[in-house]
């Protein structure tokens, strides 16, 4: 395996345009990167651009701060998976970690895992 096959090629800029994501996908295929990582709103576009390729689609949820409600993260996960995401990268609520509110953190993660599981996909939990 080459180093390229380990790269998650990412564009999470808040001002990323559809053309930026199309270019990201084109380059990911060209250089044989493992995956592209995009905001959930761009998962459907990435899926169309990467159709028939081996490049996986990673979607972030709760990005960038992790401070949204757990139910929002679960809904974002459901949307991303339903629209073609192969993997979910979740941002946990750092404030709750700092407060050592482990029950909240566990419930936050569990909500995303459950939403992902309901869509019958396997991803990684962060």
Per-region residue spans from a language model:
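Active-site-adjacent beta->alpha loops and helix N-cap segments on the catalytic face
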Residues: 18, 38-55, 68-72, 95-115
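Conserved small/polar residues in nucleotide/adenosyl-binding loops
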Residues: 119-126
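Glycine/small-residue-rich loop that forms an oxyanion/phosphate-binding "nest" at active or ligand-binding sites
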Residues: 59-99
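Generic N-terminal amphipathic, Lys/Arg-enriched alpha-helix
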Residues: 1-14, 22-29
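Conserved beta-strand positions in the central sheet of alpha/beta enzyme cores
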Residues: 34-37, 87-89
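Conserved, mostly hydrophobic/aromatic
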Residues: 8, 46, 80, 125
